[in-house]
């Protein structure tokens, strides 16, 4: 499996969206920034904020699109082109309705599963052959409640669980950085007793 060179967190920009469930991807890359001591810098040609950090001694670019969720592919494809990175070296972190808060899952390839940031990225790339980190936010129970759910803030317990899932994903990230994605998946997906 290919080593990672670009990690993107999906979300919506602006303080009004900062703590929403939909910004679980932003939360992941922000946690990486916090651990590394790096800082975000706005890069208008890439339509987002960028930073370069090291994980397990490997350099990796981080990106937070400033395009709003539904247009995330514009920023992601611009970054891939600019840094000459193939999609197989890309990890996109995003919120996942179909996983409970406290759960995070890695996968490679597939569809968008209704996630509009992934939908736009797949549309612009022409395929879904890239890595994903799915951060569980839970489902409100009925499809009519999805929009207010993802754009709303999680309660204290769910928020703590989402934070724990982000931390668990960061803990296995060195394996993925080294190209050992299957082992990273195995460790992340194994329930802690």
From Swiss-Prot:
Main location: cytoplasm
Catalytic site positions: 22
Catalytic activity entry: an N-acyl-L-alpha-aminoacyl-tRNA + H2O = an N-acyl-L-amino acid + a tRNA + H(+)
Subcellular location: Cytoplasm
Swiss-Prot/TrEMBL site (Discriminates between blocked and unblocked aminoacyl-tRNA) positions: 12
EC supergroup of this enzyme: hydrolase
EC number: 3.1.1.29
Site (Stabilizes the basic form of H active site to accept a proton): 95
GO cellular component annotations of the record: cytoplasm
InterPro entries xref list: Pept_tRNA_hydro (IPR001328), Pept_tRNA_hydro_CS (IPR018171), Pept_tRNA_hydro_sf (IPR036416)
Annotated GO biological process: protein quality control for misfolded or incompletely synthesized proteins; rescue of stalled ribosome
Any one GO molecular function term: tRNA binding
Entry-linked SUPFAM superfamilies: Peptidyl-tRNA hydrolase-like
Binding residue positions for tRNA: 17, 68, 70, 116
Keywords: Cytoplasm, Hydrolase, RNA-binding, tRNA-binding
A Pfam family it matches: Pept_tRNA_hydro
HAMAP family: Pept_tRNA_hydro_bact
Family of this protein: Belongs to the PTH family.
Biological role: Hydrolyzes ribosome-free peptidyl-tRNAs (with 1 or more amino acids incorporated), which drop off the ribosome during protein synthesis, or as a result of ribosome stalling.
Known partners and oligomeric status: Monomer.
Name under which the protein is recorded: Peptidyl-tRNA hydrolase
């Amino acid at each position: 499996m290919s080593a990672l060179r670009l990690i993107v967190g999906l979300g919506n920009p602006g303080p009004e969206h900062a703590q929403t469930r939909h910004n679980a991807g932003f939360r992941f890359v922000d946690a990486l920034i916090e651990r590394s001591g790096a800082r975000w810098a706005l890069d208008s040609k890439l339509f987002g904020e960028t930073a370069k950090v090291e994980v397990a001694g490997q350099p990796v670019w981080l990106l937070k699109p400033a395009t709003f969720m539904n247009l995330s592919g514009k920023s992601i494809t611009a970054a891939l082109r600019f840094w000459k990175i193939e999609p197989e070296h890309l990890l996109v972190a995003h919120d996942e309705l179909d996983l409970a808060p406290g759960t995070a899952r890695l996968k490679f390839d597939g569809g968008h599963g209704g996630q509009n940031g992934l939908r736009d990225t797949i549309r612009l790339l022409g395929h879904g052959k890239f890595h994903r980190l799915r951060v569980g936010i839970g489902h409100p129970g009925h499809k009519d409640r999805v929009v207010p759910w993802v754009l709303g803030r999680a309660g204290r317990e769910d928020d703590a669980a989402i934070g724990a899932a982000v931390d668990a994903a960061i803990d296995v990230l060195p394996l993925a950085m080294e190209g050992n994605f299957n082992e990273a998946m195995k460790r992340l997906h194994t329930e802690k007793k």
